[in-house]
Amino acid sequence: MKPEILKLIRSKLDLTQKQASEIIEVSDKTWQQWESGKTEMHPAYYSFLQEKLKDKINFEELSAQKTLQKKIFDKYNQNQITKNAEELAEITHIEERKDAYSSDFKFIDLFSGIGGIRQSFEVNGGKCVFSSEIDPFAKFTYYTNFGVVPFGDITKVEATTIPQHDILCAGFPCQPFSHIGKREGFEHPTQGTMFHEIVRIIETKKTPVLFLENVPGLINHDDGNTLKVIIETLEDMGYKVHHTVLDASHFGIPQKRKRFYLVAFLNQNIHFEFPKPPMISKDIGEVLESDVTGYSISEHLQKSYLFKKDDGKPSLIDKNTTGAVKTLVSTYHKIQRLTGTFVKDGETGIRLLTTNECKAIMGFPKDFVIPVSRTQMYRQMGNSVVVPVVTKIAEQISLALKTVNQQSPQENFELELV
């Protein structure tokens, strides 16, 4: 049996490799070897699997659908990517850049995480020509979905080696800056921060457009000094800066998630407006799955931790729950009383959100693959952008660039085509 079929079965039922292996009473290591192609699943085991899952999966349709599924990149596994990240980054980026000429614009993806920003800009006609991410598990998810292994520590990447691009995208960490200011003889106040790495690149590449994402706390971070330094730095470099805060729940996502967004253009004549939230609401109950197994919270943990009388209580939801849930955080798997949202379902009556439910409240497509452990999945989803919001911003950026080119063909904003 081909590995792709086994992956498809797990994806449809939202099972881990261990859960899938338990269905036919083999070790998770055996299942892992089947999926990786190291060994082949015996037909008898596949027949046993069909018998066990006949009420949940139409295997004839499954075989027919296989060719219609999104491509899953699996030439390299997690271990190979962890050990040989930079070498594989070089190899996969060379392949990626071959068809960059056919795109509307080219962009780079810094602090890329699992690729939420990339997903958003690609659907608007962009082509990614460089990506960077330090976390090995996020790299694996990124590779599985896009076929590219991101480069590692951006501080070790020479700016001159980064390809020319039209848009720099970055969901950078929020860090305080020096209060010394730009006095002669002193370092720039951004020195030693990840924003400084962005500055270093755009100084070298003269990047025409920037898209930056951060937590809304950036606005008041360090008594407003952080945002002040960012804007002053970009304006001193000739950029026209726009920024705002948008809430995902206003874009048809059942999650209250506010984020800070900044868009900047070197061309001062470009007119840009952030997307007006369509104010489309979606109830969390609409995306919840039924009869879920494997995500339950033990009764002991419920009694001894979740519902202690002297402490706060978690938010419990079900299919009848309206409105949006609290912000999904990267530490969701730690089952936090005050910030956690849990579902009234499962073997013990209360469970965690499933992989598919997390994808839904972050706006990822259903076929986006999460090849890592559940703990890593929660971390990755909690650290990601909400795809539909960024997609709308990317659409506005693309529209602004096209409009200025049409209006001023002689003195237009030339996109790099190298």
From Swiss-Prot:
What reaction gets catalysed by this protein?
a 2'-deoxycytidine in DNA + S-adenosyl-L-methionine = a 5-methyl-2'-deoxycytidine in DNA + S-adenosyl-L-homocysteine + H(+)
Q: What biological-process terms (Gene Ontology) are attached?
A: DNA restriction-modification system; methylation
The enzyme's first-digit EC class, named in words, is: transferase
EC number(s) per entry: 2.1.1.37
| Protein keywords | DNA-binding, Methyltransferase, Restriction system, S-adenosyl-L-methionine, Transferase
PANTHER family attached here?
TRNA (CYTOSINE(38)-C(5))-METHYLTRANSFERASE (PTHR46098:SF1)
Q: What is this protein called?
A: Type II methyltransferase M.MspI
The encoding gene: mspIM
